[in-house]
Amino acid sequence: MLSFLKLVFGPDITVKGFDYTDDTPYYIKDGYTPQLLSWGDHACVLLKPNGSSWRLPTLKKQLKKFQELCSLPCALCLDNLSALQRRSMLEEHIPFVSLSQQVYLPFWG
């Protein structure tokens, strides 16, 4: 994923671990792996689901909950994304990075 992001954003983009805040619900702590994505003055938290089976309404609800607790913009990091899932996420304005080389981070302009 990082090599693709470097092609899109340039060599200054980095990905590193991110620690949850104490008030993060356990269902988010147990269900996702967080990473901090940084590019120049911009940063966001990527939430990657730990399981391979997920439902878009659940992801959207949990991303919104985590966004309320986090001081940074948040996006989903997904392994596989079908065309239908991608279209649904774009229509609902859900930020994401897909390992299949697709990126939608509207808060970065």
Show the residue positions of the predicted features:
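Charged, structured surface patches that assemble and position nucleic-acid processing machinery
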Residues: H93-L105
